[in-house]
Amino acid sequence: MVVASAPAKPGSVGQQESASRDATASPWVTIVWDDPVNLMTYVTYVFQKLFGYSEPHATKLMLQVHNEGRAVVSAGSREAMEVDVSKLHAAGLWATMQQDR
Protein backbone atom coordinates (compact mmCIF):
# COMPACT_ATOMS: atom_id res chain seq x y z
CA MET A 1 0.00 0.00 0.00
CA VAL A 2 1.41 3.40 -1.02
CA VAL A 3 0.33 6.49 0.86
CA ALA A 4 1.04 9.85 -0.73
CA SER A 5 0.54 13.17 0.93
CA ALA A 6 -1.33 15.90 -0.82
CA PRO A 7 0.71 18.82 -2.14
CA ALA A 8 0.89 21.78 0.21
CA LYS A 9 -1.53 24.60 -0.48
CA PRO A 10 0.03 27.98 -1.25
CA GLY A 11 0.69 29.80 2.01
CA SER A 12 0.29 26.66 4.11
CA VAL A 13 2.66 25.76 6.93
CA GLY A 14 4.30 23.01 4.84
CA GLN A 15 5.08 25.41 2.01
CA GLN A 16 6.30 28.13 4.39
CA GLU A 17 8.67 25.68 6.10
CA SER A 18 10.01 24.62 2.70
CA ALA A 19 10.59 28.23 1.66
CA SER A 20 12.27 28.92 4.99
CA ARG A 21 14.60 25.93 4.54
CA ASP A 22 15.48 27.10 1.01
CA ALA A 23 16.28 30.59 2.29
CA THR A 24 18.63 29.31 4.99
CA ALA A 25 20.24 26.68 2.75
CA SER A 26 21.58 29.31 0.36
CA PRO A 27 24.37 31.36 1.90
CA TRP A 28 24.34 35.12 1.86
CA VAL A 29 27.19 37.21 0.47
CA THR A 30 28.53 40.69 1.16
CA ILE A 31 29.35 42.72 -1.93
CA VAL A 32 31.61 45.78 -1.96
CA TRP A 33 30.97 48.21 -4.81
CA ASP A 34 33.40 50.57 -6.50
CA ASP A 35 33.11 54.18 -5.45
CA PRO A 36 34.81 57.40 -6.56
CA VAL A 37 35.91 58.37 -3.04
CA ASN A 38 38.07 55.73 -1.35
CA LEU A 39 41.68 55.12 -2.30
CA MET A 40 42.68 51.62 -3.36
CA THR A 41 45.18 51.39 -0.50
CA TYR A 42 42.44 52.26 2.00
CA VAL A 43 40.08 49.60 0.61
CA THR A 44 42.88 47.01 0.89
CA TYR A 45 43.52 48.13 4.48
CA VAL A 46 39.83 47.82 5.40
CA PHE A 47 39.64 44.28 3.99
CA GLN A 48 42.70 43.30 6.01
CA LYS A 49 41.44 44.82 9.26
CA LEU A 50 37.77 43.79 9.07
CA PHE A 51 38.16 40.31 7.63
CA GLY A 52 41.73 39.40 8.58
CA TYR A 53 42.68 38.84 4.94
CA SER A 54 46.33 38.69 3.94
CA GLU A 55 47.65 41.65 1.98
CA PRO A 56 47.75 39.69 -1.32
CA HIS A 57 44.15 38.47 -0.88
CA ALA A 58 42.90 41.91 0.18
CA THR A 59 44.69 43.46 -2.81
CA LYS A 60 43.13 40.90 -5.17
CA LEU A 61 39.64 41.75 -3.88
CA MET A 62 40.33 45.49 -4.07
CA LEU A 63 41.45 45.13 -7.70
CA GLN A 64 38.30 43.17 -8.48
CA VAL A 65 36.22 46.01 -7.01
CA HIS A 66 38.25 48.56 -8.99
CA ASN A 67 38.24 46.70 -12.32
CA GLU A 68 34.87 44.93 -12.29
CA GLY A 69 32.91 47.35 -10.14
CA ARG A 70 32.21 44.87 -7.35
CA ALA A 71 33.57 41.93 -5.37
CA VAL A 72 32.14 39.38 -2.98
CA VAL A 73 34.16 39.81 0.21
CA SER A 74 32.41 37.45 2.63
CA ALA A 75 29.77 34.71 2.73
CA GLY A 76 27.72 33.17 5.50
CA SER A 77 24.47 33.52 7.37
CA ARG A 78 22.19 36.48 6.78
CA GLU A 79 22.89 37.82 10.27
CA ALA A 80 26.66 37.63 9.80
CA MET A 81 26.44 39.43 6.44
CA GLU A 82 24.32 42.18 8.02
CA VAL A 83 27.14 42.70 10.53
CA ASP A 84 29.77 42.75 7.75
CA VAL A 85 27.78 45.30 5.72
CA SER A 86 27.41 47.51 8.79
CA LYS A 87 31.16 47.38 9.46
CA LEU A 88 31.95 48.23 5.84
CA HIS A 89 29.50 51.15 5.93
CA ALA A 90 31.14 52.40 9.14
CA ALA A 91 34.47 52.30 7.28
CA GLY A 92 32.97 54.41 4.48
CA LEU A 93 32.71 51.69 1.82
CA TRP A 94 29.68 50.98 -0.34
CA ALA A 95 28.43 47.49 0.49
CA THR A 96 25.28 45.43 0.10
CA MET A 97 24.29 41.86 0.78
CA GLN A 98 22.30 39.36 -1.22
CA GLN A 99 21.39 35.72 -1.14
CA ASP A 100 23.82 33.67 -3.22
CA ARG A 101 21.85 31.27 -5.41
From Swiss-Prot:
Comp. bias intervals (Polar residues): 13-23
UniProt cross-references to InterPro entries, sorted A to Z: ClpS, ClpS_core, Ribosomal_bL12_C/ClpS-like
Pfam families in the record: ClpS
Gene Ontology biological process terms, A to Z: protein catabolic process; proteolysis
Annotated segments matching region Disordered: 1-24
SUPFAM superfamilies, alphabetized: ClpS-like (SSF54736)
General function of this protein: Involved in the modulation of the specificity of the ClpAP-mediated ATP-dependent protein degradation.
Stored HAMAP family: ClpS
Family indicated by similarity: Belongs to the ClpS family.
Subunit note: Binds to the N-terminal domain of the chaperone ClpA.
This protein's name: ATP-dependent Clp protease adapter protein ClpS
Organism: Mycobacterium marinum (strain ATCC BAA-535 / M)
